[in-house]
Amino acid sequence: MNTATLLLLTRPATSSAPTDDNGFVEADASSPHVNVMDLGITRGDGFFETISVVAGHPQALEPHLARLKHSAELMDMPEPDTDVWRLAVLAGIEAHQLEHGVQRELFAKLIMTRGVEGTGTPTGWVYVDTGEDFTAAREGIRVVSLDRGYRHDVAETSPWLLQGAKTLSYAANRAALREAARRGADDVIFVSSDGYALEGPTSNVIVRNGNRVRTPATDQGILAGTTQASVFEFFDARGFETSYEHIPANELAAADALWLVSSVRQASPITNLDGKDFQVDADLAAELNTYLLSRTH
C-alpha cells in the first residue's frame, strides 16, 4: 500500500512564474505526474535532499535547504525557492500525520530536475513517507573500502564531474552497494585513487582516535554532511577534539572507532572494515543515536 504524501511544486525556483497557490499542490502519490521526457528521468539531470523527520520534526531543515541551493549552483540550474520548499516540507509532514497519525520516524525527499529539455522550466516535488527500520544498522555494520576512481582533488581539477552536488545520478553508488553485498558487507567507504578516505555512497565517515574525532574534509568533492555536523556537536559537547582533514585510507585500520552517518539512518558504528574487526562501544553508539534522534531543528 502506498503511504507516501506527495506535493508537486508549482514554483520550485525563484525564477518560476507566479501562481495562485502557496507554490505547491498535494497530489495522489500512486498516480503518474512527471513527464516521461523530463531530463531528471532521461538523464538523471537534477538533485535531491532527504530529510529525517522524527516525531513530526524535520531535522536540519535549513542546512538541507542550503545544500539544495548549493547543488543547483554547481549544476547551473535555477535557484530553488527555499521558502516554497520549506513550506512544502512542513505541509507534507502535516498532511501525512493527518492521514496516518504521528509516527516516530519518517523521511521527506525533495527532488528538483532540469525539467523537459528546451523548456527551461524545472520540475520539483516533495514526498513524505515512512522509512526502513534501521535498528540493526544503528548497532553495527560491516563495511568494505572501494576505489572511487578519482583523485581527492577532483572537485578542483574537474568541476564538471559535479563531485559535491547531490545529483539524481546514483547508479554508481547503488552499484557500489551491490558490490559490498557480494563481498558480505553492508556498506562502503569510497577511497580516492591517490589513497584518501572520502565518504560512503549515502553517508559521511567519522573516525575516532582517543579524544580526537575527524571526518574527511569537504574540499575533496564530497557532500557536507548535515548529520555529520550534528555528530560533531555531540562530541564537542563531551570534550572531544573535532576536525575536518584529509585522512589517508590506511589510517582507518588504526582507529578506535568508525561510523557512517546519514540523515535517515543516523549513526552506524562499523564493526568490520575490509576484514578487520572493530570493538563497538555500545553505550556511546546508543547515546549518539539518542542525541541525533532528539534533534528538533
Each model region followed by its residue ranges:
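Helix-start/capping segments and mature chain N-termini
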Residues: 1-80, 87-91, 118-297
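Short, acidic/charged, Gly/Pro-enriched secondary-structure junctions
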Residues: 12, 86-115, 129
